[in-house]
Structures are given as structure tokens and as C-alpha cells.
Amino acid sequence: MEKTRKLNRIAIQEGRCAVLQGSVTDMAFEDSRFDAATAFETVYFWPDLPRCFREIWRTLKPGGTILICNESNGDTDKDERWTQIIGGMTIYKDIELKTCLEQAGFHEVQIRKKKRWLCVTARK
């Protein structure tokens, strides 16, 4: 949290940014509040992926976008070594993320891969 506050100091001072800590499973925001949501290297650790995507869907405005970006895309056995080193980590393949997003109500799911990286976008 401290590093985030430091990196965003000016935006915070100008009232353009707020740094809050919470859980993606139960966010304390009203429905349809945000235009976009991002998840960089975090979905690996979410406890209940479908529930988390439903919660993000709830907080996005109609037409809002979610962007997920992961360094490990699950396409090789090398990715699994991380799950043995880091407790509680799950590496999802593109089809798993797409399925969970669609089940949560998202559409226009787009998948982009480059080397071992995976980026997924979807709209509410």
C-alpha cells in the first residue's frame, strides 16, 4: 500500500486517485460505479474466480471493460513450477478465464497472447 501511495502521490493530492485495500470477492462499491477494472498478475490468487468476476461485473458501468494481464498463460509445464513455489497460486489458461468471464455475464471476450504473456479483455 505504501509503495502504491508513493507512486501515485501527485494523483492522490489532486484528488484523481484513491488507494484502498479490500477483497475482490466483496468490494465496498455501489453497482455500476467504474468504467474499467484491471487485474495485473493477481487472478492467480483470487479464492473463487467466478465469484470475483461476478463482483467486478456488478461494479462496472454498462459497457465497462475488464483487463486481465498475466505473465504465465498456462500453456507450458514451466508455468506449473510457480504453483509449487508460491502457495495458493493457480495459473489459468485462456479458455478458463474466458469461460468464467462469460458465466459472470461478460461478453466480447478477447484473448491476446505474446510469448508466455496472456491478456484478456471483456465488456459488461
Task: Please identify what each model-predicted range represents.
Residues 104-124:
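Core SAM-dependent methyltransferase catalytic element
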Residues 1-26:
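Class I SAM-dependent methyltransferase SAM/SAH-binding core
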Residues 63-70:
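Conserved beta-strand signature within the Rossmann-like core of class I S-adenosyl-L-methionine
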Residues 36-49:
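A short SAM/SAH-binding and catalytic strip from SAM-dependent methyltransferases
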Residues 88-104:
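Short alpha-helix
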Residues 71-88:
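Short, glycine-/aromatic-enriched active-site segment of Class I SAM-dependent methyltransferases
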Residues 25-37:
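A short acidic, Gly/Pro-enriched loop at the edge of an enzyme's catalytic core
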Residues 50-62:
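A short glycine-rich, Lys/Arg-flanked "PGG" loop and its adjoining helix->strand segment in the class I
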